[in-house]
Amino acid sequence: AESEAAESVADTQTTEGGTITVAASATPHAEILEEAKKILADQGWDLEITIFDDYVLPNEVVESGEFDANYFQHIPYLENFNAEKGTHLVNAGGIHYEPFGIYPGTKKDLSELADGDTIAVPNDTTNEARALLLLQDNGIITLKDGAGLEATVNDIAENPHNVKIEELAAEQV
């Protein structure tokens, strides 16, 4: 996502370089940007990367013009953020595909899931739905008919393992 100020920078066809400020999550986004920083430096650009540990501030600092861009979110999250917060952020382009998975924690695999175990899911609208759909695809829960990309824990129709779904900030999951 980027602000109008960053859009004007992106539209400028200069080779003089300058500074680009980016708000990013630590992994993998800041790591990827560190590699891009080397390439940009060869072209006369200074990439300043600031790591944020939440999913709200990076959008707020771009919207305010304090940063040129951010790098941490997928398009559904960006669109939902704009709708909820009245912001005007835009997608500047895709960089990488971020897979979503189920990680068994202390278990070797999902077959060791026991009745009453706790499963953490992101608490933001788009990522929570993705997590719940993934749990459904793996037979852990069943969602109500029609629960799609806006599903919440309230849409769980069946929970045969009586797992506890704990909603946490995405960066904590």
Predicted region positions:
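Short, low-complexity disordered leader/linker segments with a strong preference
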Residues: 1-19, 42
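Short, polar/charged alpha-helical segment
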Residues: 26-48, 57
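A conserved helix-loop-strand patch within extracytoplasmic ligand-binding domains
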Residues: 92-142
